[in-house]
């Protein structure tokens, strides 16, 4: 028996397909994939290529955000001359160039990228929610921060999917650095808040470059190139 598109079960299926499509588009994740158990699966090469491309977009946007914030606030409030605080992710570092990098397994690099992205989920959420409280903050700064948060969440889902394919199962690593900078973001003293934002945006930009580099190293290793 043929069913028309007006049949209840067909309408339900169509709505499900549309909702899945919108979910992946809104998270800026990998566009060519099938969804199983709420996760995105495509060919390994497609997932990795899209992840690298998305990491490049995030790094570029993070640089633009830092430049915009630095231009609007850093000079006038002398933020640059203050002692910068250590980033909460400073323990997560890339392998050193040379033999250490060459011997590092792709899964180790993917887990590093995943930890960095997970470590920034809470801070980025607070950044986006609290930035509007800054005096004279520009719409450009707000939109860039929001875009970084959305794309970073999407990239995390992509990295998870790649790890699942490489390890034949979900082996999510929950061990990532915590963040304790909320009190400074909510300080009643404007200079304290500005410095907290400045240091946070600086650290986030540094870590987006780490993620990008880690994913490019994975791509290089999978391609069996000898110079990575």
Swiss-Prot record:
PROSITE patterns: SOMATOTROPIN_1 (PS00266). CDD domains: prolactin_like (cd10288). It comes from Mus musculus. Pfam families: Hormone_1. InterPro entries: 4_helix_cytokine-like_core, Somatotropin/Prolactin, Somatotropin_CS. Residues 1-28 form the signal peptide. It is found in: Secreted. GO terms for molecular function: hormone activity. This is Prolactin-2A1. The gene is Prl2a1. GO terms for cellular component: extracellular region.
């Amino acid at each position: 028996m043929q069913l028309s598109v007006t049949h209840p079960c067909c309408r339900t299926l169509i709505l499900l397909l549309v909702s899945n499509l919108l979910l992946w588009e809104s998270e800026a994740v990998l566009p060519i994939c099938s969804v199983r158990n709420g996760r995105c699966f495509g060919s390994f090469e497609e997932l990795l290529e899209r992840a690298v491309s998305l990491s490049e977009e995030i790094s570029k946007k993070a640089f633009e955000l830092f430049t915009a914030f630095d231009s609007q606030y850093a000079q006038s409030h002398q933020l640059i001359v203050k002692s910068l605080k250590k980033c909460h992710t400073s323990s997560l570092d890339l392998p050193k160039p040379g033999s250490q990098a060459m011997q590092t397994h792709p899964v180790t690099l993917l887990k590093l990228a995943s930890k960095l992205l997970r470590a920034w989920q809470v801070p980025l959420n607070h950044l986006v929610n609290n930035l509007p409280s800054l005096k004279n903050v520009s719409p450009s700064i707000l939109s860039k921060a929001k875009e970084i948060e959305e794309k970073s969440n999407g990239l995390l889902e992509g990295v998870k999917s790649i790890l699942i394919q490489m390890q034949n199962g979900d082996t999510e690593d929950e061990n990532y650095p915590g963040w304790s900078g909320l009190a400074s973001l909510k300080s009643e003293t404007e200079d304290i808040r500005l410095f907290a934002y400045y240091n946070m945006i600086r650290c986030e930009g540094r870590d987006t470059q780490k993620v990008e580099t880690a994913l490019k190293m994975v791509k290089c290793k999978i391609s069996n190139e000898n110079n990575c």
